[in-house]
């Protein structure tokens, strides 16, 4: 039996390894060494993902968390029962939860610590493991929450070139790009089933014979959305959702109730590796993990240690439910 203190110390050490996207190697080495300490072989795949396999009973379950964080170092400390640090919520708390659920469960589990989730999900897109029966992705849903849907993510580049005319007439490239943005933004709404977005890059300047402008936008897309074919698409990950009646969802509902909580099924307006891994393997995928997602990417990122420890037990019980019902 692994002690509470050991589980807290593991998470603290994991968060202390600063790992913005592209610099996940320190976390990878730590995970591989930690698995080996518990007698489980782990290795790096071709893109830098950490893979560990636990043999047991029941269906094959993929536990996929990510090792990278957004930039912005936060001094790591424990105060009032909370662990502060970059990645404590997004998503090293869930990753540590997956680590201990793998160690302590008597089930067929593939653990995957993925790279580049905060970038273009290179880790998920290039993951090559045997087809699982169920996929659980490590993202903060709250101890009593299960995320059953995420909006899609569409990154598009628009460019405009406008021949020079007298300054008192016509519009330049910047104005045309602004018109394009306003046309798109007319379709924005709130919630899971609406389009939303923001400008992530905008440059415009004068050249010798013309005006040039470039705008890159990121749109969060609802289920069923397909972009116009003429757009210059940099990256597109469609929306994803799983049925509330899925055996995977029902297993978590039972496990959360067993812990004394009322389950909350969530659909989020962000995007996660569920959007890639669910369609990639053609099986149901949800996201689960401790932490308040409102603290993602903020200077105030912190996780309640009690919730982290509870999430490990809930995840283990959900895995047990899946294994028992196979």
UniProtKB/Swiss-Prot annotation:
UniProt-annotated catalytic positions: 68, 117
Name the pathway it acts in: Amino-acid biosynthesis; L-lysine biosynthesis via AAA pathway; L-lysine from L-alpha-aminoadipate (Thermus route): step 5/5; Amino-acid biosynthesis; L-arginine biosynthesis
**Which keywords has UniProt assigned to this entry?**
Amino-acid biosynthesis, Arginine biosynthesis, Cobalt, Cytoplasm, Hydrolase, Lysine biosynthesis, Metal-binding, Zinc
Q: Which SUPFAM superfamilies match?
A: Zn-dependent exopeptidases
Q: What is its main location?
A: cytoplasm
| Chain sites annotated for binding Zn(2+) 1 | 66, 90, 139
Q: Which domain of life is it from?
A: Archaea
Kindly list the biological process annotations in GO that this record carries: arginine biosynthetic process via ornithine; L-arginine biosynthetic process; lysine biosynthetic process via aminoadipic acid
What PROSITE patterns does the entry give?
ARGE_DAPE_CPG2_1 (PS00758)
Which top EC class applies here?
hydrolase
Q: Name one GO molecular function term.
A: hydrolase activity, acting on carbon-nitrogen (but not peptide) bonds, in linear amides
Names of the cofactor(s): Zn(2+); Co(2+)
Which catalytic reaction applies to this protein?
A: [amino-group carrier protein]-C-terminal-gamma-(L-lysyl)-L-glutamate + H2O = [amino-group carrier protein]-C-terminal-L-glutamate + L-lysine; [amino-group carrier protein]-C-terminal-gamma-(L-ornithyl)-L-glutamate + H2O = [amino-group carrier protein]-C-terminal-L-glutamate + L-ornithine
Instruction: Write down how the cofactor binds this protein.
Output: Binds 2 Zn(2+) or Co(2+) ions per subunit.
Task: Write down the HAMAP family for this protein, in alphabetical order.
Answer: LysK
Purpose: Catalyzes the release of L-lysine from [LysW]-gamma-L-lysine and the release of L-ornithine from [LysW]-L-ornithine.
Q: What is the similarity comment for this entry? A: Belongs to the peptidase M20A family. LysK subfamily.
Recorded protein name is Putative [LysW]-lysine/[LysW]-ornithine hydrolase
